[in-house]
Amino acid sequence: LGCEVHLYEMRPHRSTEAHQTADFAELVCSNSLKSESENTAPWLLKQEMRRAGSFLLRDADSSAVPAGHALAVDRVVFSARVAARIAALAGIGTGPGTITIHREEVLALNENDPNTITILASGPLTSPALAAELERLTGAGHLAFYDSISPIVDASSIDMSKVYFAARYDKGTADYINCPFTKEEYDRFLDALTTAEPVPAKSWEQIPTSPAALSSIHPQDCHPERSTAEAKDLRFDAAPKSSENLPLTTDPSPLHYFEGCLPIEETARRGRDTLRFGPMKPVGLTDPKTGRWPYAVVQLRQENLRADSYNLVGFQNHLKFSAQARVLRLIPGLENAAFLRYGQIHRNTYINAPTLLTETLQLRAHPSILIAGQLSGVEGYTESIASGMLAGRYAAALAHGRQPQPAPRLTANGSLTHYITHAESKRFQPANITFDLLPPLEDDLRKKIRDKKERHRIQCDRALAAWNLWLKSSKESPTVNRPSCDTLVETIP
């Protein structure tokens, strides 16, 4: 986009409670960028990004590992490709089209310099100093909820005689390893899980959370290989309302979790069958040994291109490592599992975007500062990449003296941004991309077309057409009455 970029990264000098490396684009949670099934909302968002030339999505595509209908990446390869791309631009000097890397923590933002456009994309683990600086600028407290990391197991330690490869309902390729449970095995596992010792909450984690942040349910976030429609079949409240499915224990944790990615032990406490109607749902996963669906299933998803490690889908948790080792080895096929990473919880920080941001992701009070990624209130890797892509385009327009044009409401990108900037501020909560965020079809068309898939196809066609026009017109937006900027500063601790 013809800008000189100064990229700030605080690692390795200051790390976070979740990151393990100093690498760019380190994926600390899932390795999935969600569904690639045509005419789904995640697919639409990625299609728009591909048409806009998203480098991060290009690197994700080239780092892909088998994951059925999802785009999952080898996180090490993905990070290395992003780093190589940045290094190539950082090694050609200074001036338009170059990047200068600064390995230092950002402690202050200069909102008064008209010649500097800043993109703040510090993510869910924004450092305390930068969070305090952002609070100084906005005058509003930040919100917080807790995000989770799933365990990873060494593939060579899986007992393949007890598990099987399968895709749900045999759709697509059989990329997932399925660990089947009998009722007795499930009951034993559930009892151990709900009584396992959790990690005590640290003082820095106990930040007041908006009640609204506790009410959103996005099941596909913890089942990213499934479409939004399939994820709705996994609603936790879909379990039978029987006395056997009453909550097992009182929640001992003082933390407030994002409902779309609950720790597995928190889900289990909601009833004995809740896991079987959620992340351990066996429907459509026929066991070749019995010819039937198991009582419950744990799915393992390939973690890297070498296929030497797998993550436990939906098994993010907040248990002590010793407890995890004991409980997870009750999963059939994982009795002798070697865990390369255990599950963890980390705090996720985001701003009250409806109060603070314009539709071009600029702070209302300080328009030379843009907020992108999860800090802006979008939820998920794909949504964060999309948000950063838009912020970069808007910032480049400002730097070249043009008025940035917001992405059209008809598009997935535009609808996601419209949501975070127009939601009810008192009840604002992070959002994944879903068709609920896009404008609905006209009433007469909805009456005429009853099939939901066909409706979604029309929404996707309209979105891509509007996106193509926007890409063309945004290059021709009128100039703004402000000095041209020669520096774009992106701050990513």
Pin down the residues of each PLM region.
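A conserved beta-strand/loop capping segment in the N-terminal third of enzymes
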Residues: 19-20, 36-83
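A glycine-rich dinucleotide-binding beta-alpha-beta segment and adjacent secondary-structure elements
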Residues: 312-378, 385-387, 405-423, 428-434, ...
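Intrinsic disorder/low-complexity segments
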Residues: 91-98, 111-115, 206-255, 475-493
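Glycine-rich FAD pyrophosphate-binding loop
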Residues: 3-21
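Internal hydrophobic alpha-helix adjacent to the cofactor/substrate pocket in enzyme cavities
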Residues: 385-405
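N-terminal phosphate/diphosphate-binding loop that engages ATP/GTP or pyrophosphate donors
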Residues: 15-39
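Predominantly flavin-linked oxidoreductase catalytic cores and closely associated redox partners
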Residues: 89-93, 97-219, 251-301, 306, ...
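C-terminal auxiliary extensions adjacent to catalytic cores
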Residues: 431-475
